[in-house]
Regions:
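One-carbon transfer enzymes
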Residues: 1-205
């Protein structure tokens, strides 16, 4: 069943939240029929919390370390998401696994973005600059970005959307990362727009 528009988004982030900012900018510009309901960070010093404050979105720090266990984090996160009326959970640089209670409550309603063309160069430990180092080490001629549904396994859920990025001669991991990030900032808001308009049916994936 299509998600009602505007999408009621809850963000999960760990650090800078630049993908989240791209989505917030699209909402503010009227290009994405969505509402940001809450930003949850497991890192109290995450810039994503400051981005949330500037955008007028409630921000919340929740971590297993502060709450005492992964189970307590899972419970608290689900309570916060439900309490803010979230219909779609959007991971934006969230460096932890999403807990089983949240996944059970939001079946096919948790999205993540990965800086490669999954299933290549994904899985545990494949994040940040490591992904681009692996792409170059493998001699790939192209890489890209994947938006996918989240399940219990890292970078494993059904693919929602992908965009390709050519690997240039002489690319460094840092140069490739910068170009891929630009594509992330375009693909994530566009994919959410297509979901909001019913062009992508998450339940059909």
């Amino acid at each position: 069943m299509p998600l009602p528009a505007p999408l009621a988004i809850g963000f999960l982030a760990s650090h800078g939240g630049s993908n989240m900012q791209a989505i917030l900018d699209a909402i503010a510009a009227g290009a994405l029929p969505a509402e940001a309901r809450i930003v949850i960070c497991n890192n109290s010093g995450a810039r994503a919390l400051e981005r949330a404050r500037v955008a007028g979105v409630p921000g919340l720090h929740l971590s297993a370390a502060a709450l005492g266990s992964e189970e307590a984090l899972d419970r608290a996160m689900l309570e916060a998401l439900r309490g803010h009326g979230v219909g779609l959970v959007v991971c934006a640089g969230y460096m932890r696994k999403v807990g089983p209670r949240v996944l059970a409550a939001y079946v096919r309603r948790v999205l993540n973005i990965h800086p490669a063309l999954l299933p290549r160069h994904g899985g545990k430990g494949m994040y940040g600059i490591r992904v681009h180092e692996a792409v170059l080490a493998a001699g790939e001629r192209e890489t890209g970005v994947t938006v996918h549904l989240v399940d219990e396994v890292y970078d494993h859920g059904p693919i929602v959307a992908q965009a390709r990025v050519p690997v240039q001669p002489g690319d460094t991991p840092e140069a490739l990362q910068a170009r891929v990030l630009q594509t992330e900032h375009r693909l994530y808001p566009e994919t959410l727009r297509r979901i909001a308009l019913g062009e992508i049916d998450l339940d059909a994936l």
